[in-house]
């Protein structure tokens, strides 16, 4: 297991609300909580930047963190991330913020401390460009959207 340095920026974490933890041995994500000053209503079509009360430092350039939506919020309530995925670079040290978007048709109440997103560590491979005049030919070639089937 990789050690992830974290700072608690909101004193309610660790007291009123638990530190992020894996729910099961097979869990990939750590739940992030909405550390708002008060319960907030997110109207249809509205976006809101929500503090998590945590900052992290991954430190290893071979890793990055992703902030992803919680599947139940998106499926049941239309609550997703405003930027779809939040990418946290290994050298970022600021507070984790969640861009929350209500794409649903009804207002959604976000309670203080509610689990609003999840944090997942992923491996990163950095690449450099090797400039070429032509690519080796492949069966697909430059075929793009819809090229490999009718849907």
Curated annotation (Swiss-Prot):
Gene3D superfamilies linked to this entry: 2.70.40.10
Cofactor names: Mg(2+)
Binding site for substrate: 70-72, 83, 87-89, 97
Keyword Magnesium: yes
GO process annotations (BP): dUMP biosynthetic process; dUTP catabolic process
Enzyme class, UniProt record, top EC level: hydrolase
Catalyzed reactions: dUTP + H2O = dUMP + diphosphate + H(+)
GO terms, molecular function: dUTP diphosphatase activity; magnesium ion binding
Protein's pathway: Pyrimidine metabolism; dUMP biosynthesis; dUMP from dCTP (dUTP route): step 2/2
Taxonomy, superkingdom: Bacteria
Alphabetic keyword roster: Hydrolase, Magnesium, Metal-binding, Nucleotide metabolism
Pfam families: dUTPase
EC number: 3.6.1.23
Family statement drawn from the similarity comment of this UniProt entry: Belongs to the dUTPase family.
NCBIfam families in UniProt: dut (TIGR00576), PRK00601.1 (NF001862)
Entry-linked PANTHER family: DEOXYURIDINE 5'-TRIPHOSPHATE NUCLEOTIDOHYDROLASE
Role: This enzyme is involved in nucleotide metabolism: it produces dUMP, the immediate precursor of thymidine nucleotides and it decreases the intracellular concentration of dUTP so that uracil cannot be incorporated into DNA.
Protein name, UniProt field: Deoxyuridine 5'-triphosphate nucleotidohydrolase
Native source organism of the sequence: Pseudomonas fluorescens (strain SBW25)
């Amino acid at each position: 297991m990789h050690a992830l340095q974290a700072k608690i920026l909101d004193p309610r974490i660790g007291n009123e609300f638990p530190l992020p933890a894996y729910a099961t041995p097979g869990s990939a994500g750590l739940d992030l909580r909405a550390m708002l000053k008060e319960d907030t209503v997110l109207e249809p079509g509205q976006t809101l930047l929500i503090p998590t009360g945590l900052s992290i430092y991954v430190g290893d350039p071979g890793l990055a963190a992703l902030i992803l939506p919680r599947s139940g919020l998106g499926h049941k309530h239309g609550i997703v991330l405003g930027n779809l995925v939040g990418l946290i670079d290994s050298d970022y040290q600021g507070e984790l913020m969640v861009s929350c978007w209500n794409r649903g048709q009804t207002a959604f109440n976000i309670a203080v401390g509610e689990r609003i997103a999840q944090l997942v560590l992923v491996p990163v491979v950095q690449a450099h460009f090797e400039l070429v005049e032509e690519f080796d030919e492949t069966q697909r070639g430059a075929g793009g959207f819809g090229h490999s089937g009718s849907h």
